[in-house]
């Protein structure tokens, strides 16, 4: 449970266009858990590595990071460049005594450190879609440099298929809320109200994109802090799977499987006609991108691996027989 002060850099602005005036909401994400990842790999029939060291990039309030560090023997490192986030995460680590080292550094600062070990598991949830192209490249270079052979990467990111129709309204929402130091909870609420009035006016945009109103009605009730971090950063770039795959290939990573177990059962997502079409596509990259379009998927949760190894039938059977389960219920 160590806090490491940041090193000096030549950055002209530490925010890089990211919302920092409002702290992010708290939340827990099981996909960031290496133990969960190992089970998902088993479900996909893939070999997973022994994970001794793990790292989370852009951990927010650090709830998932702290739970995973406190609940295992894995050594954890993590960074979030908003000082209030790092301080809150450090308080949690101090309380639990977790084997965890916390930084409040930017991706440029953290990813270029020379004193970090090689990691078996590296994760980032959401932030890929909210950061600049330069910061995305810092992450890719970090994966290339610091992920062990056989290591696993988790990436959660906004998908273009589900967000394309919302892009124009997001731009108006961002402009109405202001930018830089002017963003506040009140400004976010005012911007939401303005867009609500806008959507009451008949327009060709809504005629062609009827689902936009339904989705906007849903997000109106969201915490302004969530809306600010989700939609109001300078950079907001939903991407196709094919684009992410190209980035990952720079770090010698290949797609392993979805972190969402329901996607391991295609018949729950696709009808026969859809499945037949998908089965004609040889390219994994194109197939996943087309699947996202069919589902109008807004968010992907993916595992990537440096050295993909499929388990034999004997290995798979042996591992399933050795797998332990705990059944829980709500009272």
State the predicted function of each range.
Residues 75-80:
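Conserved SAM-binding motif I beta-strand of class I
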Residues 112-121:
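A short acidic, Gly/Pro-enriched loop at the edge of an enzyme's catalytic core
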Residues 97-109:
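Conserved SAM-binding strand-loop segment of SAM-dependent methyltransferases
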Residues 61-73:
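Conserved SAM-binding loop of SAM-dependent methyltransferases across substrates and taxa
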Residues 152-182, 190, 198-204:
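Conserved class I S-adenosyl-L-methionine
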Residues 137-149:
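A short glycine-rich, Lys/Arg-flanked "PGG" loop and its adjoining helix->strand segment in the class I
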Residues 21-52:
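Conserved alpha-helix/loop element of class I SAM-dependent methyltransferases that forms part
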Residues 206-331:
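Rossmann-like AdoMet/SAM-dependent catalytic core
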């Amino acid at each position: 449970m160590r806090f490491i002060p940041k090193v000096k850099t030549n950055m002209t602005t530490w925010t890089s266009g990211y919302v920092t005036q409002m702290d992010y909401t708290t939340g827990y994400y099981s996909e960031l858990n290496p133990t969960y990842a190992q089970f998902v790999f088993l479900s996909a029939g893939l070999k997973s590595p022994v994970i001794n060291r793990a790292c989370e990039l852009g951990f927010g309030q650090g709830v998932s990071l702290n739970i995973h560090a406190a609940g295992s023997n894995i050594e954890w490192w993590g960074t979030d460049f908003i000082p209030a986030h790092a301080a809150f995460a450090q308080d949690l680590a101090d309380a639990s005594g977790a084997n965890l080292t916390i930084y409040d550094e930017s991706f440029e600062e953290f990813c270029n450190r020379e004193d970090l070990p090689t990691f078996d598991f590296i994760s980032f949830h959401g932030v890929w879609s909210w950061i600049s192209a330069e910061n995305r490249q810092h992450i890719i270079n970090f994966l290339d440099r610091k992920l062990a052979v056989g290591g696993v990467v988790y990436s959660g990111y906004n998908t273009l298929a589900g967000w394309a129709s919302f892009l124009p309204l997001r731009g108006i929402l961002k402009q109405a809320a202001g930018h830089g130091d002017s963003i506040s909870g009140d400004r976010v609420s005012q911007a939401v109200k303005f867009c609500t009035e806008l959507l009451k006016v008949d327009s060709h945009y809504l005629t062609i994109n009827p689902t936009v109103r339904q989705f906007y009605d849903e997000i109106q009730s969201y915490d302004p802090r969530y809306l600010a971090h989700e939609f109001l950063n300078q950079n907001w770039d939903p991407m196709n799977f094919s684009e992410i795959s190209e980035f990952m290939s720079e770090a010698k990573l290949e797609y392993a499987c979805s972190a969402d177990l329901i996607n391991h059962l295609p018949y729950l997502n696709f009808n026969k006609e859809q499945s037949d079409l998908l089965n004609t596509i040889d390219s994994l990259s194109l197939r996943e991108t087309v699947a996202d379009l069919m589902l109008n998927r807004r968010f992907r949760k993916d595992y990537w691996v440096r050295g993909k190894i499929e388990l034999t039938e004997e290995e798979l059977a042996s591992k399933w027989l050795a797998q332990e389960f705990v059944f829980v219920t709500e009272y």
